[in-house]
Amino acid sequence: MSKEKIVLAYSGGLDTSVAIAWLKNKGYDVIACCIDVGEGKDLEAIKEKGLQVGAWKSVVIDAKRDFAEQFVLPALQAHAMYEQKYPLVSALSRPLIVQKLVAVANQYGATAIAHGCTGKGNDQVRFEAGIHALAPEMKIEDPIRDWHWSREEEIQYAKDNGIPVPITKASPYSIDENLWGRANECGILEDPWAAAPADAYDRTVSIEEAPDTPTTIEITFNEGVPTAIDGEEMPLDQLIMKLDKLAGSHGIGRIDHVENRLVGIKSREIYECPAATVLLAAHKDLEDLTQEREVAHFKPLIEQKMSGIIYNGLWYSPLMKSLVAFIDESQAVVNGVVRVKLFKGNVICEGRKSPNSLYDKNLATYTSADEFDQEAATGFIKLWELPDKVYAQVQNKNKKKVKENTSDAY
């Protein structure tokens, strides 16, 4: 009789390696699945390690391009920033990982999926809500949430099951990273008054260490999609990686944020999002040039709602699909080039041009070349002010009547 199969979201670290043994001891054939969203890991080494520690099968998937095009791009076009500050680094990768885990489960006939999230964070919700949105009958296991071990007990379990324990200096931080950025928490960062030390950062230099000379680049967008830097076209994932290094070298993208977690607690996080910071600024700048006024004023409502949906793990909800449809429609006119200066932590959009520009210099100028019909303003103002004017007239008339009636009473 064949064993029940389970797909484990596998990182190659101690926690998920121990999870392989724990799930095996529970009676599963474990399919270790490592999905690369831009962490820079050695996929082949992770694949081999999964087999060495007891996985029935080990699968690695390079999903950087899918991540960039299917998940990062909609968030960029929606200017998705949780609480107006966090570009949703980890939250964006979870629905992509879920998508791949479910696909692998279907491929191998697995009846369950396992993840390695704690019972205190947002990710457990994102994984499980996403899995059940795509595969409602799929069973879910969470070894780390279930076993309640101390670090010492986990290490002993690893030794008992022949799992190599890495002998390295323990990092005080908990780090998650992908193409779109790097998230760091724990250690001294748990004190919101303490300044983040230098070793909390990896993708960015400090403002003090940033070059004294700015770098100016031009970013090209086609229907809201960044397609080129300084005229050099490249796939979105490569563009993000290139821009990440460049912007990070100028100290751009450091975010120190105390955020409201889905599970009800506040958490202090240090984020590094160099490419995201630049692209969000440039995309918004081009939209300012090309979006019609009512669309431009309404779109932030959609952006805020989408940010919350992504953060709270509801990427596959019906509402998300509807909101993305609005964003897609709004991007048809977002074509052009934005000139951006990078300097000591600052992103300065200093020029923009577009074939869809709604800026008309002849209407905007205050010189003799002005084509704006100022005489038309008089009639427009009379119509525009009419509701408030009539309201004021009626109120004044009623106040006068009340005053007269009061005088007559005496």
Swiss-Prot record:
Annotated InterPro entries: Arginosuc_syn_C, Arginosuc_syn_N, Arginosuc_synth, Arginosuc_synth_CS, Arginosuc_synth_type_1_subfam, AS_cat/multimer_dom_body, Rossmann-like_a/b/a_fold
Catalytic activity: L-citrulline + L-aspartate + ATP = 2-(N(omega)-L-arginino)succinate + AMP + diphosphate + H(+)
Positions contributing to ATP binding: 9-17, 116
GO annotations of cellular component type: cytoplasm
Stored PROSITE patterns: ARGININOSUCCIN_SYN_1, ARGININOSUCCIN_SYN_2
Keywords, alphabetical: Amino-acid biosynthesis, Arginine biosynthesis, ATP-binding, Cytoplasm, Ligase, Nucleotide-binding
Pathways involved: Amino-acid biosynthesis; L-arginine biosynthesis; L-arginine from L-ornithine and carbamoyl phosphate: step 2/3
GO molecular function, one term: argininosuccinate synthase activity
Leading EC class: ligase
UniProt-listed HAMAP family: Arg_succ_synth_type1
Record NCBIfam families: argG, PRK00509.1
Record's subunit section: Homotetramer.
Protein name: Argininosuccinate synthase
Organism: Limosilactobacillus reuteri (strain DSM 20016)
Gene: argG
